[in-house]
Regions:
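Short intrinsically disordered, low-complexity segments
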Residues: 41-45, 70, 78
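Short arginine-rich
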Residues: 71-86
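Short intrinsically disordered terminal tails
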Residues: 1, 83-91
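A short, exposed loop/beta-hairpin motif centered on an aromatic-Gly-Thr core
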Residues: 48-68, 72
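Short N-terminal "domain-start" leader segments
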Residues: 1-39, 43-44
Length: 91
């Protein structure tokens, strides 16, 4: 049985332990077979600083890929330096 992504998508609040910065990780459905996972720098109350300019945005073509990417980024972002992580995903 295939899992169906909630129309609103996935959303996680993440506090980076090494830098104490806060981030929001969001995955949304952009089309039938297109999903976007984005990471936004956030304020103390986990409100994204710039909604139009995510720190990292990646597209995937299946729901399982999108969920895996979302949870992997959220988990790694808690314990790794953000700049290094973003550079790794951009290359």
């Amino acid at each position: 049985m295939a899992r169906v992504l909630n129309p609103k998508g996935l959303f996680n609040k993440v506090k980076n332990l090494p830098t104490r910065q806060r981030f929001v990780v969001s995955t949304i459905r952009k089309g039938d077979d297109l999903f976007e996972t984005a990471v936004f720098a956030a304020t103390f109350f986990f409100v994204p600083r710039h909604l139009s300019k995510p720190d990292l945005a990646m597209e995937t073509h299946s729901q399982d890929e999108a969920w895996d990417l979302h949870h992997e980024i959220a988990a790694r972002l808690t314990r790794e330096y953000p700049a290094k992580l973003f550079q790794e995903y951009r290359s």
